Swiss-Prot record:
<dbReference type="InterPro" id="IPR026872">
    <property type="entry name" value="FTB"/>
</dbReference>
<dbReference type="Pfam" id="PF00432">
    <property type="entry name" value="Prenyltrans"/>
</dbReference>
<keyword id="KW-0862">Zinc</keyword>
<keyword id="KW-0677">Repeat</keyword>
<feature type="compositionally biased region" description="Low complexity">
    <location>
        <begin position="420"/>
        <end position="449"/>
    </location>
</feature>
<feature type="binding site">
    <location>
        <position position="296"/>
    </location>
    <ligand>
        <name>Zn(2+)</name>
    </ligand>
</feature>
<keyword id="KW-0808">Transferase</keyword>
<feature type="site" description="Important for selectivity against geranylgeranyl diphosphate">
    <location>
        <position position="85"/>
    </location>
</feature>
<feature type="compositionally biased region" description="Low complexity">
    <location>
        <begin position="119"/>
        <end position="133"/>
    </location>
</feature>
<feature type="repeat" description="PFTB 4">
    <location>
        <begin position="268"/>
        <end position="309"/>
    </location>
</feature>
<dbReference type="GO" id="GO:0005965">
    <property type="term" value="C:protein farnesyltransferase complex"/>
</dbReference>
<dbReference type="GO" id="GO:0008270">
    <property type="term" value="F:zinc ion binding"/>
</dbReference>
<dbReference type="InterPro" id="IPR008930">
    <property type="entry name" value="Terpenoid_cyclase/PrenylTrfase"/>
</dbReference>
<feature type="region of interest" description="Disordered">
    <location>
        <begin position="117"/>
        <end position="140"/>
    </location>
</feature>
<dbReference type="InterPro" id="IPR045089">
    <property type="entry name" value="PGGT1B-like"/>
</dbReference>
<feature type="binding site">
    <location>
        <begin position="297"/>
        <end position="300"/>
    </location>
    <ligand>
        <name>(2E,6E)-farnesyl diphosphate</name>
    </ligand>
</feature>
<feature type="region of interest" description="Disordered">
    <location>
        <begin position="402"/>
        <end position="451"/>
    </location>
</feature>
Amino acid sequence: MSSIEEIDTDETFTSDYVSARKDEVDDIITATTIAQKKMENSILEKLNSTENGNIIEKKKILNFLMNGIEKIPMSHQGLDSSKVWISFWILNGMDMLDSLDSYPNISSRASKYLSILQNDDNNGNNNNRENNQNGGGFGGGNSHTSHVVSTFAAVSALYVIGTEESYKTIDREAMYKFLMRMKTKEGAFTSEDGGEYDSRTTYCAIAVASMLNILTAELERGVVDFLLSCQTYEGGFGAYPFNEAHGGYTFCSVAALSILNSLHKIDMNSLHRWITYRQSNDGGFEGRTNKLVDTCYSYWQGAVYIIIQSYFNYYKKQQQDDGDGKEGDQQEEGLLFNQAKLQEYVIRFCQQSDKKYSGFSDHPHRGKDYYHTCYGLSGISLSQYNEIGKAIQSLNTFTNTFEQPSPPINKKSTNVFTISNNNNNNNNKNNNSDDNNNNSNNNNNNSENQLVEPVHPIYNIKLSKCEKGFEIDLFLFQKEFKDASVSLGTLFFYAKFILK
């Protein structure tokens, strides 16, 4: 008899949804329902625990991230090709805690390390190896060939560092050649020479091009049609046409279409319906229908909510303007998901702390890691600022005004997750009014301490770093273009953008 058949199906289900349909699901036991049941039990344990797990352990999280700068745990040996991603997760996590400079010389050291991962065009000095005829881009680790996804991680990490040294690290001309070489006839981008292509690799290529101001018509050609073909009957997007809708690929498709000013071409009502059902009673987001929630989807799904809400708000305002000729009302509205419940899932259920370190795991009672710590903080950030994406602007680069994306942050959310001192029990019912007022003030102070830095929903980089990066990148472009010593080939390269 299999382990699945041995399970006692008369055992009480803790989920309200499942309990209401117990007769329907008792005969359909799968690995997912078993895992879901275990996770719900873990959440109940956390809810009944008296341990202090209701706040973001910022100092301990910072210790955990900084510890990864010098040495990576033995368990990470299999991630050698993801060194560039580990760098981004650590740097971005520290930056969201507004503590990037807490580690001595981290900006300079990180910039120099990331420069080693860059492959120059035509056998340049970086990563010089035999038959390296096709340079440009970044590899995932030392001496690795260039990969579009690794390139996105490297460029993002250099943006997070935010110094002139980090911006100058990137060879934009070689990068453009690399991206063009990855372009497919379907309008997508392959991961590497001879590699696969999907909506993920396509987003990474488009995001890199937009961040480096090298997004041209020839790079954009066919991309919108390919991404739109990835939307499924469910409403979300798959890796490529006729795949199952998936939270990560949905983010990649929606974010790339936002960069390309094509959100209006999406079946938005279908997408809205699909993503609305992705938040569970636990507060977390699941990546696919009938799958477990996962901390990383706090960003992947949370960002999609914000992007499409920006779309709805924009057209709502347009309709108001067209109706009465006056500027549309700026109503203060919450986001399309339960912000406080999402923060509760990440902070209370998935934060794993010991005496020295803290971080986030994918599920309750699992080990913390850099990946989920980074995206857990990103999801918390997105849920703490109601207007973070209210005015996502056109991301076309090199217009007459050189406008770049920088969604405004006008107010903090009122839905910052806090737990009262009585920990949801009735022991303090007899507190006098003065005590209650003090508790209220303490909760307000705790709310301020629980805020993390706001990140851009499309790039997952702190907004101030996004704005600074686009401004400095534009300055470097203009400076290089005006330099009399620039090569003829480089002049032809930059002419693509001047004549766009």
